[in-house]
């Protein structure tokens, strides 16, 4: 049986000045958190990673949803952004910021675009967290440059044990009061779905998990962002443990390879 699911909404007060907002933001992370069924021993430490080199992940999008929620996303064409269904479920509008590194600054590289044209997967299940995938259509194609680029979809699946790199502006530690100013990244290995399912009990074929041993993982605010490898996005940040981001539990991502047909049907984008 699955563990009890709790939805953590972390409210973060943020200074104004970002081109996506003309007023102070109160950002919340809608990342679903699942109670693990087993205990993992881990020494709590910073949730991983380092500040990314500015604009080294030029497909990374920052999503400001309904003036309330913050998520990440991936630019997969000049018109389409890939993100998580739990980010867009019930949303009215989204402000997509591309070309950003420090989301609390007015960087010359940033482009802000508002969209009301988006949809979640038809079979998205917010209780079981299945089909946690969504697409945002930009009202007009964005101009690509060295700071704003598209990311490729994978033509093959990612193997267990492969080191992958999730990126995002999520909380850098469980004790952090808010999300990160700057884009961060962490290198982590892919684990088996069987081992991940033994922890959460809701891990199906459409999910890929990373091993959070040592406290390296995604956290609140990273939702919808990419799982990167060799210029491709293999996953969409989906859910983690309600015990905390630093505790050594796996983090789960929507497996992009599993949804290639769905993405192509909706957008025409192929690997």
From Swiss-Prot:
Stated EC number for the protein is 3.4.21.1
Instruction: Classify the main location.
Output: secreted
Q: Which InterPro entries match?
A: Peptidase_S1 (IPR050430), Peptidase_S1_PA (IPR009003), Peptidase_S1_PA_chymotrypsin (IPR043504), Peptidase_S1A (IPR001314), Trypsin_dom (IPR001254), TRYPSIN_HIS (IPR018114), TRYPSIN_SER (IPR033116)
Sorted alphabetically, the keyword list is: Collagen degradation, Disulfide bond, Hydrolase, Protease, Secreted, Serine protease, Signal, Zymogen
Q: Which SMART domains match?
A: Tryp_SPc
Task: Cite a GO CC annotation.
Answer: extracellular region
Give the Peptidase S1 domain ranges.
46-268
| UniProt GO MF annotations | serine-type endopeptidase activity
**Active-site annotation:** 86, 132, 223
- Propeptide-annotated positions? 16-45
Q: What does this protein do?
A: Serine protease with chymotryptic and collagenolytic activities.
Q: What is this protein called?
A: Chymotrypsin BI
Give the source species: Penaeus vannamei (Whiteleg shrimp)
């Amino acid at each position: 049986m699955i563990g009890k699911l709790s939805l953590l909404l972390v409210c973060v007060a943020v200074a104004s000045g970002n081109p996506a907002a003309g007023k102070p933001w109160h950002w919340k992370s809608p990342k679903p958190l699942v109670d693990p069924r087993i205990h993992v021993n881990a020494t709590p430490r910073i949730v991983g990673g380092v500040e990314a080199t500015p604009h080294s992940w030029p497909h990374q999008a920052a999503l400001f949803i309904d003036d309330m929620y913050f998520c990440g996303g991936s630019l997969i064409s000049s018109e389409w952004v890939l993100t998580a269904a739990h980010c867009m479920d019930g949303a009215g509008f989204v402000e997509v910021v591309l070309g950003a590194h420090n989301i609390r600054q007015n960087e010359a590289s940033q482009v802000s675009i508002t969209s009301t044209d988006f949809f979640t997967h038809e079979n998205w299940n917010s209780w079981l967290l299945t089909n946690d995938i969504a697409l945002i259509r930009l009202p007009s194609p964005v101009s690509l440059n060295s700071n704003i680029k598209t990311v490729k979809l994978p033509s093959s699946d990612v193997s267990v044990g492969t080191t992958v790199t999730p990126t995002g502006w999520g909380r850098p530690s469980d004790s952090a009061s808010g999300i990160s100013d700057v884009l961060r990244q962490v290198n982590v290995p892919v684990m088996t779905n069987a081992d991940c399912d033994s922890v959460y009990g809701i891990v199906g074929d459409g999910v890929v998990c990373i091993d959070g041993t040592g406290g390296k993982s995604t956290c609140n605010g990273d939702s919808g962002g990419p799982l990167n490898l060799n210029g491709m996005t293999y996953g969409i940040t989906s859910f983690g443990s309600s015990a905390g981001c630093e505790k050594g539990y796996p983090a789960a991502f929507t497996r992009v390879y599993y949804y290639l047909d769905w993405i192509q049907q909706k957008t025409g984008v192929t690997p």
